[in-house]
UniProtKB/Swiss-Prot annotation:
Entry protein name: Large ribosomal subunit protein uL30A
Species name: Paramecium tetraurelia
GO terms, biological process: maturation of LSU-rRNA from tricistronic rRNA transcript (SSU-rRNA, 5.8S rRNA, LSU-rRNA)
UniProt keyword annotations, A-Z: Ribonucleoprotein, Ribosomal protein, RNA-binding
Function: Binds to G-rich structures in 28S rRNA and in mRNAs. Plays a regulatory role in the translation apparatus; inhibits cell-free translation of mRNAs.
Keyword Ribosomal protein applies: yes
Family per similarity comment: Belongs to the universal ribosomal protein uL30 family.
Gene3D superfamilies: Ribosomal protein L30, ferredoxin-like fold domain
Length: 248
């Protein structure tokens, strides 16, 4: 008589500590995946908002340009004159070095963020800043920057000043972390605040490190002569844009 061999299946029980670790790891993976999904969704929403804001600014700029053209045409048709609003923003560029600088001039250049040759900085127009520029006028040239030049400077030469460090503005997160509390979340917000000399211009301008430009293509004409005397230093008004384009 043949005997049936019974197979005894031994159920191996997973140790409790291993089971708990597996469960914990699974929950951790789920939490990480959830956070990643939420982060991607938030980034998508922010990018959409940045794009919407940029489009709104572009519409605002076009409307302002159209208004200026319309006013000029109207004045010409009526035989009158149209006087644009006074400039609220100046771009100052240092064109001479440090030789034979007296302490007062040196300090004023530092206050204007012009510590080095070919540094450039934005300055809000008021009585105090005009007096500062006059003190250092033989060492700088300045004028009224166009929106295009402001944009090119920030995009191509813009660095942030964070805790005394010069940090490249590689994405909008750098701006949002430092200026989000005053409503500046993106590079287009930053450009708009500078261009319009908005209510938080001080914070926006303080955030920007001085622009480090190169010597202009073709060189300067005569740095020891004023611009009105066929030289370089002093007020160029709108012609500052031609110079800065050669220095970016």
């Amino acid at each position: 008589m043949s005997q049936k061999k019974q197979k005894i299946q031994v159920e191996q029980k997973v140790p409790e500590n291993v089971a708990k670790k597996t469960q914990r790891d699974s929950k951790l993976r789920d939490a990480v995946a959830k956070r990643r999904t939420e982060r991607l969704a938030a980034n998508k929403t922010r990018r959409a908002q940045w794009e919407k804001t940029a489009q709104a600014y572009e519409a605002e700029y076009k409307a302002a340009d159209k208004s200026l053209v319309d006013n000029l045409r109207k004045a010409k048709t009526e035989g009158g004159f149209y006087v644009p609003a006074e400039a609220k923003l100046i771009l100052v560029v240092r064109i001479r070095g440090i030789n034979t600088l007296n302490p007062q001039v040196r300090q004023t250049l530092r206050l204007l963020k012009l510590r080095q040759l070919h540094n450039a900085a934005f300055v809000r127009v008021n009585k105090a800043t005009i007096e500062m520029i006059r003190k250092v006028e033989p060492y700088v040239t300045y004028g009224y920057p166009s929106r295009a030049v402001i944009k090119n400077l920030i995009y191509k030469r813009g660095y942030a000043k964070i805790n005394g460090q010069r940090i490249p503005i590689t994405n909008n997160n750098v701006i949002e972390q430092q200026l989000g509390k005053v409503g500046i979340h993106s590079v287009e917000d930053l450009i708009h605040e500078i261009t319009t000399v908005g209510p938080h211009f001080k914070e926006a301008n303080r955030f920007l490190w001085a622009f480090k430009l190169r010597g202009p293509r073709g060189g300067f004409i005569a740095k020891r002569k004023s611009f009105i005397n066929q030289g370089d230093w002093g007020n160029r008004e709108d012609l500052i844009n031609d110079l800065v384009k050669r220095m970016i």
